Amino acid sequence: MFNISPANHEFDDEIQSKIDNKTKPLGALGELENLAKQLALVLGKDKPEIINPKLLVFAADHGIASSGVSIAPSEVTTQMVMNFVAGGAAINVFCRQVGLDMEVIDCGILQPLEGVEGVIDQRLGAGTGAIHKQAAMTLGAVKQGLEMARTRIELHHQQGCNLIALGEMGIGNTSSAAAIMATVMGMKGVDCVGRGTGIDAATLKRKQMLVEQALHIHEAELTDPYNILACLGGFEIVQMTGAMLAAAERNMLVIVDGFIATAAAMVAVQINANVRDYMIFGHQSDERGHCLMMEHLQARPLLRLGMRLGEGSGAVLALPLIRAAAGFYNEMASFSDAGIEI
């Protein structure tokens, strides 16, 4: 379904030599050096540049939210989407700070926002099924969502974009992400469920129970990534998965945000392992389990700020570091350029 080539490692040694011969001690720029190498492998060894980057925020509602797994009701998803459009959310502020264009995609919130300027309609339904009682969606909806995301990424690719950051909004989506994590990593649901929006101990216990219930009733169907998405996913998680795969297919980099985005990344890697070469992990969330996801994907997040907001916040805040990595690779003098003998 997605034809993704691995990053071209033909020039590994040449790229590493260019980094090592900059006017600095070996390895002195730490993770920025690894990041610069990844940029060069994906975007080209001569002068990798970040061009026309975009943030895509995918929004949808989850049936499990009606069973009280969050401090907020599902209506908050719609309210936050309107806040995004008005420019008043944290993610809007961060995008303005780093100079990043943002778009909001309705993948399936409960009430359609017909005629609301600034919201892109890619609806797969009015919220998913409650995963502890039924499948989140059909396999047909999964395939449709993946293709919708591909079409959106293709549009940005045609406009010259070579990097996308991904964010989400959806009350109840940490439950879905925890269930996906448990399935992909072979863990118990109770060990993957965190406090999400900041729930109390009683709500946490209920959330853990419902995720375990979801894993139990769907156990026989969780045989491949598409069925994992159909049984346990969210409309926004499906479209984030598709966006990652489609971006990699077009040789674009992807900044993965936090817990929910990383759940999508785990499924994307199951669909096509080569997508991993194109992923940059913006931050390590404070949500329980995210550090284990990082280990599973052999990822080194750029930031550890104790955040658990979602929206793409960690991905956007990592963008200046990515630009800095490209900048030193392209502009920093080598020892020979500077006439320095060591």
UniProtKB/Swiss-Prot annotation:
Nucleus found in the keyword field? no
Q: Which CDD domains match?
A: DMB-PRT_CobT
**EC assignment:** 2.4.2.21
Q: Which molecular-function annotations from GO does this UniProt entry contain?
A: nicotinate-nucleotide-dimethylbenzimidazole phosphoribosyltransferase activity
What the entry lists under HAMAP family is as follows: CobT (MF_00230)
Family named by the database record? Belongs to the CobT family.
Q: What does this protein do?
A: Catalyzes the synthesis of alpha-ribazole-5'-phosphate from nicotinate mononucleotide (NAMN) and 5,6-dimethylbenzimidazole (DMB).
Record's NCBIfam families? Answer: cobT_DBIPRT, PRK00105.1
Instruction: Write the protein's name.
Output: Nicotinate-nucleotide--dimethylbenzimidazole phosphoribosyltransferase
| Organism (species) | Shewanella sediminis (strain HAW-EB3)
Lineage, broadest ranks = Bacteria, Pseudomonadati, Pseudomonadota, Gammaproteobacteria, Alteromonadales
User: Which gene name belongs to this protein?
Assistant: cobT
